[in-house]
């Protein structure tokens, strides 16, 4: 009976992973050949929050630099952080780390510890040695070693603020996307849910000291976008789903102007989100019209938010459907495989020519989700519209770990699809290059 049950389980597992066979089955050794092809690719990194090397080398130079990339969120989620004032940092986090190191974030941290510093695990016996090796490595040239030599990255796209200023010196290697949140949200303070013109003024005074009307505000936005383009940005980014729903309605200029004028007339009054949402929606449409005007793509955060405690339903990509219709000439690049809304994302990218998929961050959120949905994306969406790698982290150690996991996601997905006869080995190697490099170059019109 036990043997029968095992055979039944095996047959069910095979059925789950089986695909329609289109091509001849591969020749022996194809797994290794695909592995080698994937790891030979020079990557394009489509989404990072990296500080400059100078800033990084003046910051944390111990094992905690591995936790700058979301690991703290999982340790907080474990509800096991000690937070004992008299304890050492390791004593405070060790129990939570032991629980959280099983997650994708934890695995990425361990990959970095192993591959960059030759430490197999982070525990009570190794954390001091790991810190010593990290400190010894943090010297000029470290970014080149980790990003270009170890991770084999040819270009990194970083996020910059609404002033489009970047601290990275190597402008040929680091490209930038400019945040648009503040223009729509009327504030850079995304943890606030009331709005005043007085605080909005703090934001827009960066670009113009003479904003009194909605027309002035719109002119300020255009000026800021032109300034960003002049500084070399290659696109824009929106992630206001951390603070509100992505659902927007088309609002008349007249109604938006009424709200704007009320805020100007009573600048210290705190307006609720419900009161200002129509104005915010109008301004989001303005952002998209500027993307269209200047021929720039926009990345939009979809799916899981970082930090602890969020409204995940604010991030469902289907909430953006009306803007895909409204702005058919704007290239929308939807981020993070929309975890956990992968099916919805696939349907949108299949239906709309202007909707693209970027799995950035997803391989370290959940590797199995990324493998599963990459397969689904390849079966439903034209392959030129999918990009896989973006670390979405603030330290190069995190970028390295994410790069390895992104390669593994691509490798495991393609090996499974070749094994079943859906793709040939040759098709898989071509696709790997598209997923990890060529598609990103075309999506962002990169010049290497």
Predicted regions and their residues:
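Divalent metal-binding pocket/active-site signature
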Residues: 216-217, 231-344
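Structural preference for beta-strand elements that scaffold enzyme active sites
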Residues: 42-43, 154-157, 173-177, 233-237, ...
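Distinct, well-ordered alpha-helical segments
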Residues: 168-170, 187-191, 248-250, 309-324, ...
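N-terminal signal peptide c-region/cleavage motif recognized by signal peptidases
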Residues: 10-13
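H/E-rich (His + Asp/Glu) clusters that bind or coordinate divalent metals
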Residues: 25, 319-322, 329-448
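Mid-to-C-terminal alpha-helical segments outside catalytic/metal-binding sites
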Residues: 19-44, 66-115, 130-132, 383-385, ...
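Short amphipathic alpha-helices and their capping/turn segments at secondary-structure boundaries
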Residues: 32-39, 166-168, 218-236, 282-293, ...
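Alpha-helical scaffold segments that flank or form the walls of functional sites
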Residues: 39, 59-172, 178, 199-202, ...
């Amino acid at each position: 009976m036990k043997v029968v049950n095992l055979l039944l389980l095996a047959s069910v597992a095979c059925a789950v992973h089986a695909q329609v066979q289109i091509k001849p089955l591969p020749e022996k050794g194809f797994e290794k050949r695909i592995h080698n092809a994937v790891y030979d690719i020079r990557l394009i990194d489509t989404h990072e929050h990296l500080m400059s090397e100078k800033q990084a080398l003046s910051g944390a130079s111990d094992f905690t630099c591995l936790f700058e990339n979301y690991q703290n969120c999982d340790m907080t989620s474990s509800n096991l952080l000690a937070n004992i004032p008299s304890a050492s940092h390791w004593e405070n986090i060790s129990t939570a780390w032991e629980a959280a190191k099983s997650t994708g974030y934890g695995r990425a941290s361990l990959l970095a510890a192993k591959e960059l510093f030759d430490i197999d695990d982070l525990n009570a016996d190794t954390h001091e040695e790991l810190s010593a090796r990290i400190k010894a490595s943090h010297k000029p040239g470290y970014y080149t070693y980790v990003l270009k030599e170890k991770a084999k990255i040819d270009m990194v796209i970083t996020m910059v603020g609404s002033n489009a200023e970047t601290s990275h010196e190597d402008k040929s290697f680091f490209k930038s996307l400019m945040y648009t949140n503040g223009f729509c949200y009327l504030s850079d303070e995304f943890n606030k849910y009331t709005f005043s013109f007085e605080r909005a003024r703090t934001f827009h005074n960066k670009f113009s000291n003479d904003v009194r009307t909605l027309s002035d505000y719109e002119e300020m936005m255009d000026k800021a976008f032109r300034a960003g383009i002049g500084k070399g940005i290659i696109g824009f980014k929106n992630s206001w789903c951390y603070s509100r729903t992505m659902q927007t309605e088309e609002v008349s200029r007249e109604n938006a102007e009424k709200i704007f004028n009320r805020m100007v007339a009573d600048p210290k009054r705190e307006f609720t989100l419900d009161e200002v949402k129509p104005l915010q929606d109008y301004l989001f449409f303005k952002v998209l019209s500027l993307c269209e005007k200047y021929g720039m793509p926009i990345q939009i955060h979809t799916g899981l938010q970082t930090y602890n405690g969020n409204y995940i339903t604010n991030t469902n990509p289907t909430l953006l459907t009306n803007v895909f219709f409204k702005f058919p000439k704007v290239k929308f690049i939807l981020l993070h495989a929309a975890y956990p809304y992968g099916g919805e994302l696939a349907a949108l990218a299949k239906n709309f020519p202007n909707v693209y998929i970027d799995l950035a961050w997803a391989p370290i959120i959940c590797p199995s989700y990324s493998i599963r949905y990459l397969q689904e994306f390849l079966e439903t969406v034209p392959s030129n519209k999918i990009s896989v790698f973006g670390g979405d982290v603030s330290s190069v150690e995190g970028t390295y770990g994410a790069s390895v996991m992104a390669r593994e996601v691509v490798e495991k997905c393609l090996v499974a699809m070749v094994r079943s006869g859906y793709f040939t080995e040759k098709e898989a190697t071509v696709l790997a290059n598209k997923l990890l490099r060529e598609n990103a170059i075309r999506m962002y019109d990169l010049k290497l």
